[in-house]
Amino acid sequence: MDIATALQYSETGEASVYNDGGSIGAMGERLPKGGKYAAHRTLPLPSVVRVTSVQTGKSCEVRVCDRGPFHRRRIIDISPAVARAIGCGWGVHQVKVETISVGDGPNQRRNKD
């Protein structure tokens, strides 16, 4: 996905809770135990997204630093810390995902909305 498209990305669908940290993500970084991170199939790495639970209305800013989910019906995998922050437990949840920014440091581009 190109940067302009990524900055306008917004989708509602299924999220699954995965990986409680310690493993190496797609960017070569160790996923932090208890950290707020996510995996997405097409957004540029790294990106920051807002994940909002459709059920609770709670939201959380999340760093996308891994690839997945590998289940076709799911749009994002979230860490257990993200699930707790949006009022969800383990399992599959309906969420809305909106891009806040793409890239890190001087290369970061923010959504203008």
Regions found by a protein language model. Give the residues of each.
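Secreted/periplasmic proteins
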Residues: 1-113
